[in-house]
């Protein structure tokens, strides 16, 4: 019942549910049959099969009685009905199992037919919605398909990458992680890519992560349209057969015809044959010169003969191709054979469809017709025997077989017969290359090495070969079997240091490297290495080698070719002349080359080299480029690459092809090329030498800093740089105003240093070494500008200091003066150190900003002093010029010559009227100027380094500036110091310090007995020129120092040397001019105790004695700055140490003496040179061999003249100013005198003789005063003893009776000491009433002689208690007068007073005014003693009536004898006083009893 009820329930009410279950089961079964479309893909199929089996076998709850099958069969009709109903709805039938009783045969057939009919839905679900999804046309992608990503992978690893992704997918699925990609595949014909099917790009990145060889970031989405082609099997291949023609699609050979030699279908490549486009010269440069060849124009296609490859024979490798079996010559990754180039290219890179070559192209590929059987027989008959003779030695020499060297001919190793097919020429070269090795033959060995045979090995089985190694030429031993004959037929060329072509027989000089300096004739050239021969060489038979870039071509084909060319000098036409740059007519354009070649008929090889590129000049092929392949006298065989033609032309019909950027050489001597060309604006392309600053920077150009010296001051480099200095820069390192940049330099710019460009051309030419070209020279084109010491003056544009480049405006802040930093006008010191060799810092001036310099350019209306510029230059001021400045205001015809003047040059010995200023030309002489400029100072109120009208004294800054001190620039009442320009309107512009006057010698002018500065005298040397016995300034000499150069044992000017002082250098014993002292004081006030002339403290030896004397300064305590520097030590007033002393910034060891920073051993010299003249005056820094004048800073070998800062070699009277006097009598200025008699100025005198200026006299009656008569009868030296009593010694105690010393007690009767208390009770001259201050306000403590100052004992001041310093009781004549009209000690000391002074203000020494130091007093003053003492210091007096007082410093007096009253005027004056004057101010070498000097 239960069962029945159950069955009823199944058949009845539950029929739907049972049908549904069965229906679902059928679907599930069908789904199990259709696994790809199963709805639950995660359920495995065998579970489905098990469920089906369990279903048909009966369920567990319904098959207990085994009646389940029957129950199911009872339910089938209902299910069938339901299925039929569904079939009626869907139009489809489901697989059912009908009842056996209801199923007949017809119905079964119908069911089977319906089930398996075509297009039936048997394999589909009954209720499937996507019944039409899978059909054959469904391969076309639709929008529903997932995208395909193209991912980059390593080439050749496409399949491996796909497998890795598949493996990763399976491995990750095992751990429950699923890669969100659908499929991945690769295609054979697409290299380097795989294809991944995924919905998102991120999924692809995740899948490819951590897989090597797959670059997922380089991913591209594949377009839908490309998918069918991608999935299509590619069975079509290109059908390319061997021997067909093709054209290259891209690259260098794009469009060229190619012949297919072999095809590899598997590799999709083909071997093609091309006409090569190879640049032989580029290859030569690449392998020979070692430089990377820049990509240039594509060479023309042409066949390459084996002879052209001979140069590269050691680099060529013969290899057999593994694919084709063909043997090729491999050179630089090129495969060459029979003149053709073979390449392996991809089939895609060539186009072989429809290629129709032209006849010319086919002609190039036509094989050579080798019908030469008869030719071979004919040649063998002629040359057969000779060939056997040639071959025999090779067998004896080690069995060199035929073709063992790779072959020379076309056969390329195929034997001698083939080698000789090229004709006689190739055959003969073949014999030569295969012959035995001879001495000095060029051979190759190993792979890339080559060299020259220079000997045979000791064992006899090898050769000694000279080759170029890493560190220079080396000799190696090479076995015979390792050696090969190279292509060494002397036809190769190379480029030298200047890019000039070097050929065989050229003479070259090695400029750098281990063999630097050697010179020889080129014997061999190969791959950038040249082998030279010099008969003077002993090693390796005179042969040596070097790289071509290390050489410099000395000359072209010279004497040898001249013999053949009938005297025509080939050097007149250098390489660049062959192709002039100027747009000349064709006839003129090629004329030089035509002449050269036509005259070179006898020279085998002409001027061309094999392989050189030329251009045809005439004929129908005019303009075509060709290459030289053979040379025979003037016949040149060339090949036209563009037309593949070979013919012979005359050499005059060819022209060299020049690069457009070739720079023409402007060398003075042909062929050297060492002289670099100038640019368009005169800038030299080569590196600057000394005296050239750092390039063309606006601040560079410091004289001793900046550009490094390329050579060790060789004269040629000096000359080159001097030319440049003249043209483009301030000659002393400063830059010339841009408005002056002129490319023109006159032919006579070869003037000496400090010589004019136009008129006075000395012997030194541009090709003469040592000629100082334009220093102090104005270019000829700049007539309107005047230059200072090597400086050019532009109108209203003022240049910089000496070794400072200044701005072009006059309002630039004052750049410190010579050796000092200019302080403000108020006297405030600057704390910065500034030396004379240092770029001066700009400082504010309370009045006006200005820049000054030693050698500063003066504007048209303003003149600068020696090293200073006045920023306030205006036309209203009188142009008093300083030492080193033009005298514009001199109306005198001979108004002041320049120290190395432009017109009357120092080195010319020619006096030019109207020229003044140190190396300055008097361009415009204003009538309102009444005088000539002072030595470094405008005339009015300024002294030598001193400002007039109550200004500071010598070496002292007072209201304006001292020598090397900044001036306010707008002072009217006083001038600046020596090296400073005075703005004040002066009426009596004095002459320059080296001004030559009538009969007098100027400092740096040629005098009767002396030579001029920078002038070559008889037997003398030019300043800046080496003399036979001495050295020039700035030139190295034996025992001398180079100016600005370090020398052994000597110190250079501005250079530190051991134990010696240079100019601007502190020495242990010497002084430095413009150099900071070890004391290192930031300020140099003159009220400090123990300061010397240069402001050095008195703590040192001799109580802080400075170069100019004891520890005193020549200024008052209130003066802010010393003569040298605001901060730091002393400069040109530096302490002079122990014996040996120094000259003006230079030490002089012994009698050899040095000039201004230079020693002169020779006889005659210029400024700072020895003077060979015996009598007369000596020049400044000139040696006087005989008696007479003295030399400033020069040795005086004999006589009574003293040398200023120079040793006095002989005589009892000559003294050197600041130089040791090793003989008696002479005194040295600021130098210790070892021997008795001579004393130095401001130096202790070891012996009893002359005394120094402001120095104690160690010995008795021979002490001389500064400006005192000398012991000998024929002259006095500056600071020399006067034999006769009555004369006073300037700052010297007179051991003997008579005169008193200046600032020194006079033990004997007679004159009183100037600045010293006399025995008669007179007060010291200008002595301070209270306190022990000396002349320079030095305190009395410590030091020698109780703090005695330079010009007096301690406890005395020359400016104490009086309104003026160095003043007598009558206050008429002051050494430094406070009165407005008075002249000071330095007023006229190097200055000519042309205007008469007020009678009460005349300075001592020359009646009304001090005689100009180194100049002559032209105008008579209204003072009475004015007629008696006209002579200036270092000049002659032109007055004829003053016979016994025309003696000047450096000048021989006319009278040889005299007493103190009649004595010859010592330093610039006659001493008339024989008794102490009432005021104790005996004339120091003057005719005025009331004035010193």
Curated annotation (Swiss-Prot):
The residue intervals holding the sequence repeats read 732-741, 775-784, 789-797, 818-827, 836-845, 854-863, 866-875, 883-892, 917-926, 935-943, 944-953, 954-962, 963-972, 978-987, 1003-1012, 1013-1022, 1023-1032, 1033-1042, 1043-1052, 1053-1062, 1063-1072, 1073-1082, 1132-1141, 1144-1153, 1156-1165, 1167-1176, 1180-1189, 1192-1201, 1204-1213, 1217-1226, 1229-1238, 1241-1250, 1253-1262, 1266-1275, 1278-1287, 1290-1299, 1302-1311, 1314-1323, 1389-1398, 1433-1442, 1467-1475, 1484-1493
Segments of skewed composition (Acidic residues): 60-80
Task: Find motif (Nuclear localization signal) and give its ranges.
Answer: 21-28
Which is a Pfam family this sequence falls into? Spt5-NGN
What molecular functions are annotated in GO for this chain? chromatin binding; DNA binding; RNA binding
Q: Does the keyword Endoplasmic reticulum apply?
A: no
**Start-end of Low complexity biased regions:** 757-767, 1122-1134
Gene Ontology, cellular component aspect: nucleoplasm
The residue ranges flagged as biased composition, category Polar residues, are 790-812, 866-875, 1156-1172, 1218-1231, 1270-1283, 1366-1382, 1392-1401, 1432-1442
Q: Where in the cell is it found?
A: Nucleus; Nucleus, Nucleoplasm
Q: What effect does gene inactivation have here?
A: Decrease in the accumulation of several 24-nt RNAs. Reduced DNA methylation and released silencing of RNA-directed DNA methylation (RdDM) target loci promoters (e.g. LTI78/RD29A, YKT61/AtGP1 and AtMU1) without abolishing the siRNA triggers. Suppression of gene silencing mediated by ROS1 disruption in the double mutants ros1 rdm3-1, ros1 rdm3-2 and ros1 rdm3-3. Loss in non-CG methylation at DRM2-dependent sites. Reduced H3K9me2 at IGN5 and IGN26 loci.
Amino acid composition bias (Basic and acidic residues), ranges on this chain: 24-34, 81-92, 418-432, 586-596, 846-860, 955-1090, 1416-1430
- Described function: Effector of RNA-directed DNA methylation (RdDM) triggered by small interfering RNAs (siRNAs, 24-nt RNAs). Functions as an adapter protein that binds scaffold transcripts generated by polymerase V and recruits AGO4 and AGO4-bound siRNAs to form an RdDM effector complex. Promotes the expression of 24-nt RNAs. Required for the initial establishment of DNA methylation. Together with AGO4, required for transcriptional gene silencing (TGS) by DNA methylation and repressive histone modifications (H3K9me2) of several chromatin loci.
Quaternary state and partners of this protein? Interacts with AGO4 via its C-terminal region and with RNA transcripts. Binds chromatin at loci subject to transcriptional silencing downstream of RNA Polymerase V, but independently from the presence of 24-nt siRNA.
PANTHER family linked to this entry: PROTEIN RNA-DIRECTED DNA METHYLATION 3 (PTHR11125:SF8), SUPPRESSOR OF TY 5 (PTHR11125)
Q: What's the name of the protein?
A: Protein RNA-directed DNA methylation 3
Q: Please tell me the species this chain comes from.
A: Arabidopsis thaliana (Mouse-ear cress)
The primary gene name is: RDM3
């Amino acid at each position: 019942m239960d069962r029945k009820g159950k069955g009823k329930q199944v058949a009845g009410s539950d029929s739907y549910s049972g049908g549904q279950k069965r229906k679902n089961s059928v679907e599930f079964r069908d789904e199990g049959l259709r696994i790809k479309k199963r709805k639950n893909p995660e359920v495995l199929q065998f579970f489905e099969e098990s469920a089906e089996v369990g279903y048909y076998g009966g369920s567990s709850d319904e098959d207990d009685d085994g009646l389940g099958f029957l129950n199911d069969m009872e339910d089938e009709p209902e299910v069938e009905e339901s299925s039929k109903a569904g079939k009626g709805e869907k139009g489809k039938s489901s697989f059912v199992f009908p009842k056996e009783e209801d199923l007949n045969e017809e119905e079964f057939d119908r069911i089977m037919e319906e089930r398996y009919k075509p297009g039936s839905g048997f394999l589909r679900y009954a209720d499937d919605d996507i019944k039409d999804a899978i059909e054959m046309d469904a391969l076309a992608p639709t929008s529903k398909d997932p995208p395909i990503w193209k991912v980059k992978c390593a080439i050749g690893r496409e399949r491996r990458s796909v497998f890795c992704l598949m493996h990763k997918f399976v491995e990750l699925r095992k751990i429950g992680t699923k890669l969100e990609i659908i499929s991945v595949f690769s295609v054979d014909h697409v290299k380097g890519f795989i294809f991944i099917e995924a919905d998102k790009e991120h999924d692809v990145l995740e899948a490819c992560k951590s897989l090597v060889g797959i670059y997922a970031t380089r991913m591209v989405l594949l377009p839908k349209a490309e998918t069918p082609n991608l999935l299509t099997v590619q069975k079509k291949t290109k059908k390319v057969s061997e021997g067909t023609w093709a054209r290259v699609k891209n690259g260098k050979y794009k469009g060229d015809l190619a012949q297919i030699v072999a095809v590899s279908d598997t590799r999709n490549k083909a071997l093609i044959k091309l006409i090569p486009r190879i640049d032989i010269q580029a290859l030569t440069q690449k392998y020979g010169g070692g430089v990377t060849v820049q990509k240039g124009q594509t060479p023309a296609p042409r066949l390459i003969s084996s002879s052209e490859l001979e140069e590269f024979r050691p680099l060529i490798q013969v290899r057999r191709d593994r694919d084709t079996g063909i043997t090729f010559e491999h050179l630089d990754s090129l495969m060459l054979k029979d003149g053709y180039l073979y390449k392996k290219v991809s089939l895609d890179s060539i186009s072989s469809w429809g290629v129709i070559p032209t006849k010319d192209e086919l002609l190039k590929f036509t094989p050579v017709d080798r019908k030469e059987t008869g030719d071979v027989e004919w040649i063998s008959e002629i040359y057969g025997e000779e060939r056997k003779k040639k071959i025999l030695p090779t067998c004896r020499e080690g069995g060199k077989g035929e073709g063992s060297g790779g072959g020379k001919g076309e056969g390329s190793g195929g034997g001698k017969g083939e080698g000789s097919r090229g004709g006689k020429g190739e055959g003969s070269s073949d014999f030569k290359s295969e012959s035995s090795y001879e001495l000095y033959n060029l051979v190759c060995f190993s792979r890339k090495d080559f060299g020259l045979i220079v000997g045979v090995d000791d064992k006899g089985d090898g050769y000694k070969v000279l080759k170029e190694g890493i560190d220079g030429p080396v000799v190696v031993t090479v076995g015979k079997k390792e050696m090969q004959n190279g292509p060494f037929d002397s036809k190769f060329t190379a480029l030298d240091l200047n890019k000039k072509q070097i050929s065989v027989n050229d003479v070259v000089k090695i400029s750098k490297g281990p063999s630097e300096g050697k010179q020889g004739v080129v014997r061999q050239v190969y791959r950038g290495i040249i082998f030279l021969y010099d008969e003077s060489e002993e090693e390796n038979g005179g042969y040596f080698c070097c790289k071509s870039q290390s050489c410099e071509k000395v000359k072209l084909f010279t004497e040898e070719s001249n013999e053949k060319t009938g005297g025509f000098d080939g050097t007149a036409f250098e390489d660049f002349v062959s192709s002039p740059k100027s747009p000349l007519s064709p006839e003129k354009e090629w004329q030089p080359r035509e002449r050269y070649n036509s005259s070179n008929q006898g020279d085998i090889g002409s001027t061309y080299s094999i392989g050189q590129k030329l251009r045809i000049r005439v004929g129908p092929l005019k303009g075509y480029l060709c290459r030289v392949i053979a040379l025979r006298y003037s016949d040149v065989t060339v090949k036209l690459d563009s037309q593949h033609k070979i013919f012979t032309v005359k050499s005059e019909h060819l022209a060299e092809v020049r690069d457009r950027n070739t720079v023409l050489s402007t060398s003075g001597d042909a062929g050297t090329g060492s002289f670099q060309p100038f640019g368009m604006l005169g800038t030299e392309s080569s590196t600057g030498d000394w005296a050239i600053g750092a390039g063309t920077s606006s601040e560079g150009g410091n004289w001793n800093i900046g550009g490094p010296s390329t050579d060790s001051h060789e004269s040629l480099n000096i000359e080159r740089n001097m030319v440049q200095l003249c043209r483009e820069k301030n000659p002393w390192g400063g830059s010339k105003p841009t408005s002056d940049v002129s490319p023109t330099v006159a032919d006579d710019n070869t003037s000496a240093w400090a010589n004019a460009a136009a008129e006075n051309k000395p012997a030194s030419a541009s090709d003469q070494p040592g000629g100082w070209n334009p220093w102090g020279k104005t270019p000829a084109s700049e007539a309107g500008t005047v230059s200072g010491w090597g400086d050019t003056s532009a109108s209203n544009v003022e240049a910089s200091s000496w070794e400072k480049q200044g701005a072009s405006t006059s309002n630039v802040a004052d750049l410190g003066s010579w050796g000092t930093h200019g302080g403000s006008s108020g006297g405030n010191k600057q704390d910065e150190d500034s030396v004379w060799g240092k770029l001066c810092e700009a400082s504010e001036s309370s009045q006006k900003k200005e820049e000054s310099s030693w050698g500063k350019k003066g504007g048209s209306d303003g003149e600068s002093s020696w090293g200073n510029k006045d920023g306030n230059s205006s036309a209203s001021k009188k142009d008093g010029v300083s030492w080193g400045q033009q005298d514009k205001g001199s109306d005198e015809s001979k108004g002041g010559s320049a120290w190395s003047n432009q017109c009357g040059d120092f080195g010319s010995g020619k006096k030019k009227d109207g020229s003044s200023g140190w190396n300055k030309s008097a361009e415009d002489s204003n009538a309102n100027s009444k005088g000539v400029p002072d030595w470094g100072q405008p005339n009015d109120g300024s002294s030598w380094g001193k400002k007039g009208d109550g200004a500071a004294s010598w070496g002292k800054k007072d209201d304006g500036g001292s020598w090397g001190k900044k001036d306010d620039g707008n002072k009217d009442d006083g001038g600046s110091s020596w090296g400073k320009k005075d703005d004040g309107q002066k009426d009596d512009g004095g002459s320059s310090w080296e001004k030559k006057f009538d009969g007098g010698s100027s400092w740096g002018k040629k005098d009767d007995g002396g030579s001029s500065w920078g002038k070559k005298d008889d037997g003398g040397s030019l300043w800046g020129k080496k003399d036979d016995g001495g050295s020039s300034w700035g030139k190295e000499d034996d025992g001398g120092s180079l100016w600005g150069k370090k020398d052994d044992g000597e110190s250079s000017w501005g250079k530190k040397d051991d134990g010696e002082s240079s100019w601007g250098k502190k020495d242990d014993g010497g002084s430095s001019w413009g150099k900071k002292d070890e004391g290192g004081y930031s300020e140099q006030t003159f009220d400090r105790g123990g300061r010397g002339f240069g402001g050095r403290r008195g703590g040192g030896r001799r109580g802080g004695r400075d170069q100019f004397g004891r520890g005193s300064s020549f200024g008052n305590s209130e003066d802010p700055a010393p003569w040298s520097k605001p901060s730091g030590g002393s400069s040109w007033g530096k302490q002079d140490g122990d014996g040996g002393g120094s000259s003006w910034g230079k030490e002089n060891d012994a009698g050899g003496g040095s000039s201004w920073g230079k020693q002169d051993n020779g006889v005659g010299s210029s400024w700072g040179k020895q003077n060979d003249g015996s009598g007369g005056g000596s020049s400044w820094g000139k040696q006087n061999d005989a008696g007479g004048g003295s030399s400033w800073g020069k040795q005086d070998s004999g006589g009574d003249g003293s040398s200023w800062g120079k040793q006095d070699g002989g005589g009892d009277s000559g003294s050197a100013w600041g130089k040791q006097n090793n003989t008696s009598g002479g005194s040295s200025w600021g130098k210790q005198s070892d021997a008795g008699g001579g004393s130095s100025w401001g130096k202790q005198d070891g012996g009893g003789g002359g005394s120094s200026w402001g120095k104690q006299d160690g010995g008795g009656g021979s002490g001389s005063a500064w400006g005192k008569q000398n012991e000998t009868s024929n002259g006095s030296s500056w600071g020399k003893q006067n034999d006769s009593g009555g004369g006073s010694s300037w700052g010297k105690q007179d051991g003997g009776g008579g005169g008193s010393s200046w600032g020194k007690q006079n033990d004997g009767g007679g004159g009183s000491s100037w600045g010293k208390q006399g025995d008669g009770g007179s007060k010291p001259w200008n002595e301070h009433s209270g306190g022990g201050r000396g002349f320079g306000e030095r305190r009395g403590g410590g030091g020698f002689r109780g703090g005695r100052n330079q010009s007096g004992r301690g406890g005395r001041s020359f400016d104490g208690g009086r309104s003026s310093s160095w003043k007598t009781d009558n206050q008429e004549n002051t050494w430094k007068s406070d009165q407005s009209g008075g002249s000071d000690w330095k007023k006229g000391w190097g200055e000519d007073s042309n205007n008469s002074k007020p009678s009460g203000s005349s300075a001592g020494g020359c009646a009304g005014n001090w005689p100009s130091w180194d100049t002559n007093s032209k105008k008579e003053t209204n003072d009475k003693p004015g007629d008696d003492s006209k002579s200036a210091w270092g000049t002659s007096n032109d007055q004829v009536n003053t016979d016994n007082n025309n003696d000047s410093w450096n000048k021989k007096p006319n009278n040889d004898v005299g007493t103190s009253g009649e004595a010859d005027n010592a330093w610039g004056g006659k001493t008339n006083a024989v008794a102490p004057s009432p005021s104790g101010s005996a004339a120091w070498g003057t005719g005025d009893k009331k004035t010193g000097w």
